[in-house]
């Protein structure tokens, strides 16, 4: 883009007219596809704007001096505390971006705040100012998939448990309370699983710079004091996290402001940490937290990439549909930070990683407590294929109650784990964790395998082959009601009822879609029966070149 010029002397504020000087006209205008691809490989972007002087409030905000490897999610996160981000344009070749807020008031609050507090991404200060354009308008080209998937993920967050719609008010309140403490007092109730200092740091860092943490036990409760760099971050974290669960249905956060205004940390170890003083001694008198917690919970250790994530979790505790916060590198942490499944699905659709999404880099799942007499690679391929494109499946030769399932990426693995863990398959509740393996190895030529390892990398049954596939918008947890599609006109309701009851299941209800008889809902006697029916009948040949498509439904009959 010829109109984008190198940054000039610090302290001189530039209007965005300089960025688009070669392609701006009065009224609506278009960035040329050549200039856009030169900057970021994106297709042409359309804008509607008018001539405005630099610094005049606008919903569109110009961000400069971004790190080279910055992600869409990180850029969007700059605007989250102030309101809803409605559009995004990345110019990675120029280390710049434009974001559009839902209101001018939100944008104004954001610019005012970052004028007094310089934002930092990946250790690098960045610069924020108003754009002279009233709105961003992007097209629907394939190259926009990542940005749009990121926005969809964030919008799912904002409409979900975090209630970030109130965050602009939170920022205003925090800025108005100059005397408010930046220190939070955190109590973790219903402590079924270990909560470590690093777990708290991962969660609370989403809302600002964490300076210090001290953990302790008081009145038989695990507690912590956490100091942010500023009161605004503390206010945002309190509003967003108070009452949330770290893990499924347990480890509930209760958060209040501390009377302290600063923490004095003497040691950097598993109980306390000063992130501004890496030179502090460790104080070897205390045993490491992961060892003591593992002993307290009586659970076996699990190999983990994180030294603070070694404690095992009780294997029988699994409530798959309860939302929790995600903890990277901690096995058993299911749902992401109060992010509904739609957010993870949107991320998977765009092949992006949401900051804070558990296991974003690990695509291999360890599935245990399988029925060794009935489980097959094909049954696992079909079931896990509801939540992503399964690449390989290996049932362990000497431990056939265990299997490895490799998904296309870490987001899909997260979706499968959060939806399927604890559900019954062949009469047994399966348990799912992230595997320590990065991929599933195929057997060597001549090696005895008994057909227990299968490669599905090129399977025609993959549901999500296209980036941004609409199938990601229709992912739901296992339920007794199944959604059927691709039904030929010659197949009747009775035909389908007979088909779905042929393997011993009970059909409790059925109805065709009024406007489209190619689709129907069928209700089985239980969730377990529906799971088995999906495995048995997805891709079933109904004749007339129609293969039945089966998925879980959010609706009931």
UniProtKB/Swiss-Prot annotation:
Matching SMART domains: RRM
CDD domains named among the record's database cross-references: RRM1_PTBP1, RRM2_PTBP1, RRM3_PTBP1, RRM4_PTBP1
The keyword Lyase belongs to this UniProt entry's keyword annotation: no
Residues carrying Phosphoserine: 16, 141, 459
The entry's keywords: Acetylation, Activator, Isopeptide bond, mRNA processing, mRNA splicing, Nucleus, Phosphoprotein, Repeat, Repressor, RNA-binding, Ubl conjugation
Phosphothreonine modification, residue list: 138
Keyword Translocase: no
Domain RRM: 59-143, 184-260, 363-437, 480-555
Pfam family, one: RRM_1
Record-linked Gene3D superfamilies: 3.30.70.330
Subunit structure: Monomer. Part of a ternary complex containing KHSRP, PTBP1, PTBP2 and HNRPH1. Interacts with RAVER1 and SFPQ. Interacts with IVNS1ABP (via BACK domain); the interaction is direct.
Summary of the function given for this chain in its UniProt record: Plays a role in pre-mRNA splicing and in the regulation of alternative splicing events. Activates exon skipping of its own pre-mRNA during muscle cell differentiation. Binds to the polypyrimidine tract of introns. May promote RNA looping when bound to two separate polypyrimidine tracts in the same pre-mRNA. May promote the binding of U2 snRNP to pre-mRNA. Cooperates with RAVER1 to modulate switching between mutually exclusive exons during maturation of the TPM1 pre-mRNA. Represses the splicing of MAPT/Tau exon 10.
The protein, known as: Polypyrimidine tract-binding protein 1
Organism (species): Homo sapiens (Human)
């Amino acid at each position: 883009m010829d109109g984008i010029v190198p940054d000039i002397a610090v302290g001189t504020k530039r209007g965005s007219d300089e960025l688009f000087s070669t392609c701006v006209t009065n009224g609506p205008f278009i960035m040329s596809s050549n200039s856009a691809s030169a900057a970021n490989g994106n297709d042409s972007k359309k804008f509607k704007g008018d001539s405005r002087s630099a610094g005049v409030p606008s919903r569109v905000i110009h961000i400069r001096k971004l790190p080279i490897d910055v992600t869409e999610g990180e850029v969007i996160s700059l605007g989250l505390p102030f309101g809803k981000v409605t559009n995004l344009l990345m110019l990675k070749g120029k280390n710049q971006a434009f974001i559009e807020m839902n209101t001018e008031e939100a944008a104004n609050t954001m610019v005012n705040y970052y004028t007094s507090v310089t934002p930092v991404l990946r250790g690098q200060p960045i610069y924020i100012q108003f754009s002279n354009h009233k709105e961003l308008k992007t097209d629907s080209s394939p190259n926009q998939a990542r940005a749009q998937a990121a926005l969809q993920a964030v919008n799912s967050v904002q409409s979900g448990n975090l209630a970030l719609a109130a965050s602009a008010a939170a920022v205003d309140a925090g800025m108005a309370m100059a005397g408010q403490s930046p220190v939070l007092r955190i109590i973790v109730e219903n402590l079924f699983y270990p909560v470590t200092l690093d777990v708290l740091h991962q969660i609370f860092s989403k809302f600002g710079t964490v300076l210090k943490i001290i953990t302790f036990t008081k009145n038989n409760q695990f507690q912590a004091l956490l100091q942010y760099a500023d009161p605004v971050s503390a206010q945002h974290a309190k509003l967003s996290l108070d009452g949330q669960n770290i893990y499924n249905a347990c480890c509930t956060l209760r958060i209040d402001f501390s009377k302290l205004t600063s923490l004095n940390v003497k040691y950097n170890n598993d109980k306390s940490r000063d992130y501004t003083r890496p030179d502090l001694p460790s104080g070897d008198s205390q045993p490491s937290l992961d060892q003591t917690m593992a002993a307290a919970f009586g659970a076996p250790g699990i190999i983990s990439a994180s030294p603070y994530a070694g404690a095992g979790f009780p294997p029988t505790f699994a409530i798959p549909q309860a939302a929790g916060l995600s903890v990277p590198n901690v096995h058993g942490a299911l749902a992401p930070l109060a992010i509904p499944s739609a957010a993870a699905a949107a991320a998977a659709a765009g092949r992006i990683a949401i900051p804070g999404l558990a296991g974003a880099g690990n695509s291999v799942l360890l599935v245990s407590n399988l029925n060794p007499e009935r489980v097959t690679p094909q049954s696992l391929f079909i079931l896990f294929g509801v939540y992503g494109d399964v690449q390989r499946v290996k049932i362990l030769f000497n431990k056939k109650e265990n299997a490895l399932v490799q998904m296309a990426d870490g987001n899909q693995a997260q979706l499968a784990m959060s939806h399927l863990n604890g559900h019954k398959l062949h009469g047994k509740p399966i348990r799912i964790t992230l595997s320590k393996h990065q991929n599933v190895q195929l057997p060597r030529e001549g090696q005895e395998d008994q057909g227990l390892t299968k490669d599905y990398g090129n399977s025609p049954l993959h549901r999500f082959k296209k980036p941004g596939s609409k199938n990601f918008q229709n992912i739901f947890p296992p339920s007794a009601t199944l959604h059927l599609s691709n039904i030929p006109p010659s197949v009747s309701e009775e035909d389908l009822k007979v088909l779905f009851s042929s393997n011993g299941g009970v059909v409790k209800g059925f109805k065709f879609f009024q406007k489209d008889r190619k689709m129907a809902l069928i209700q089985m006697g239980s969730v377990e029966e529906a799971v088995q029916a999906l495995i048995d009948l997805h891709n079933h040949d109904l004749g007339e070149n129609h293969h039945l498509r089966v998925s879980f439904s959010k609706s009931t009959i």
